[in-house]
Amino acid sequence: MTKEHSRYRWFVVTVFFFFMLLHQTDKLMIGSLQVQISNDFQISNTQWGLVNSGALIVATVLYPIWGYLYDRYSRTKLLSLASLIWGATTWFNAIVKSFGGFLVTRASTGVDDSSYPGLYTLIADYFGPTQRGRVYGILQLAQPLGYLIGMILALMVAPAIGGWRSVFYITGSLGLVIAVLIFFFVKEMPRGKAEPEFENMAEMQTFKFSWAEAKEIFKKKTMWFVFLQGFAGVFPWNVITYFFFAYLEKERGYDANGILFTMAPVILILASGYFVGGSLGDFAFKRTNKGRI
């Protein structure tokens, strides 16, 4: 590997890190804005639950569709499109004046929420299996850090610059900037390029999506444990993300500073776990193929 290629692939990681960081900021800060938005539209907790459920349902439906598209078309162009959609839907979400419009436009933000599979597969073609855990750990840092930045924007910045709509304009605009950055500066890589098995091949075969192979995933018992573990892990976090801030403010009487200093240490500890876990996974994998398990 040339020094130039080595530097470039870390440039790609940097671009994708900021894509995830700013996207997670945009996605997760709505929980910190619950009281502001609920007061603006005069909605109940049940209606607030519908706001967040809409985006989750849309994202769930579109995960396999994004995956299918990533297997057939350029991942860089699709990721640029996802970033463009993120920026546009967030702007629409800020513009609408009625709760019905807000509900629909918020659900539309789920379109780009399910776009991450292509990012991870593209990174896998830049880095070999012995480095991926560390790189994925770095990228996953973006989620809790984005959560923290979203809290700061919602609790500290929004009241100072005109309310929640103003911060949506900021994060939506950043999505458009990232879309341009990915489109023009991130290069597609041949699929499987970083796999050791393909290292000495003069010409690589082009692989296409296969429904038959996709169905084989569900026959692997290990994958069912992964699905169940993911469900059990995500379930409580959705409650914390979308309802906990209003609970602290309304039920416990916390002010913005109190909420921030209560949640920030938890988020920072969570963030450290991503990088440490990824690095330990790489360390164990170098010694046995079952190291990450």
Label each PLM-derived region with a short phrase.
Residues 187-212:
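Flexible cytoplasmic inter-helical loops of multi-pass small-molecule transporters
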Residues 139-188:
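Helix-loop-helix hairpin linking two adjacent transmembrane segments in secondary transporters
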Residues 61-99:
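Conserved MFS/SLC helix-loop-helix module at the cytosolic interface between two early adjacent transmembrane helices
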